[in-house]
Amino acid sequence: MSRSLKKGPYIDFRLDNKVQALNDSAKKTVIKTWSRRSMISPEFVGHTFAVHNGNKFIPVYVTENMVGHKFGEFSPTRTFKGHAAKGKK
């Protein structure tokens, strides 16, 4: 189910505060986050986030096409090793 429109998007307040501080100081540093459920807002465009996938941090550079999506969509948690070759059953 999607989130109700009357509630608005969820953005972690700590993450929002960090981006606001970086925008004010005009610095470009990597922002570490564990908040995979946070929605990407237009203020995040141009910043690099290190999104935790449960094991390590995956760097994600935010572009305009990513606005409205969530951080978890860009850091996969599972690795696909491939199916067994034919005859290897």
From Swiss-Prot:
Keywords: Ribonucleoprotein, Ribosomal protein, RNA-binding, rRNA-binding. This is Small ribosomal subunit protein uS19. InterPro entries: Ribosomal_uS19, Ribosomal_uS19_bac-type, Ribosomal_uS19_CS, Ribosomal_uS19_SF. Belongs to the universal ribosomal protein uS19 family. Protein S19 forms a complex with S13 that binds strongly to the 16S ribosomal RNA. GO terms for molecular function: rRNA binding; structural constituent of ribosome. The keyword Nucleus does not apply. The keyword rRNA-binding applies. The gene is rpsS. One of its GO terms (biological process) is translation. One of its GO terms (cellular component) is small ribosomal subunit. Pfam families: Ribosomal_S19. Gene3D superfamilies: 30s Ribosomal Protein S19, Chain A (3.30.860.10). PANTHER family: RIBOSOMAL PROTEIN S19P FAMILY MEMBER, SMALL RIBOSOMAL SUBUNIT PROTEIN US19M.
